[in-house]
Amino acid sequence: MFEDYKYLIEIYVKLLLVVKKTITEYNRVTSICKDLFLKKLVDYGSAWRILRLSSLTDQIFIKAQRIRGLQQNKTQKINESQSDEFIGIINYSVMALIQIQEGVSEIPDFNTNKCSELYDIMINNTKELMMNKNHDYGEAWRDMRVSSLTDLILQKLLRVKQIEDNSGNTIVSEGIDANYSDIINYAIFALIHMDLK
């Protein structure tokens, strides 16, 4: 009987360590992404606030296509790495989630503090989703290749484009915001695999 409890305790401790590792890695990646987001905010202000969702989707799609091209061709003429593009995917997806919540603006209307606060809210919501899915799927993403994560991002983007073309309506599928959240998580998983520092 004691051996059974000991075994269960060992499994529980291992699971806690894996969860702690995932949260640490996740926070490290999102900290790097937010740092770049805020630096660009200083340079450009919140000009992105005028972008409609379809424009953000297209920007993310271009970045995902470029990553796939780099993975297949290994030749590049622009000095930006896959990591740079994944960070861009994360930040544009956060912008999209903010636009869904706050609506599109006609002018750059957010200051740095407001953007930082909203960024944290979106990332925290997305992290909570990741933790729930990790609970159900057992961190299956750790066994996936970066190229597979790229393909999943592209698939989600094609779904988002279709939903946008349907005026945001779905019959049985999750909405645009859920797809953007998944895209963020897939990109973060890719950066964890690539050991972003």
Regions found by a protein language model. Give the residues of each.
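Intrinsically disordered, low-complexity regulatory regions
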Residues: Y5-K197
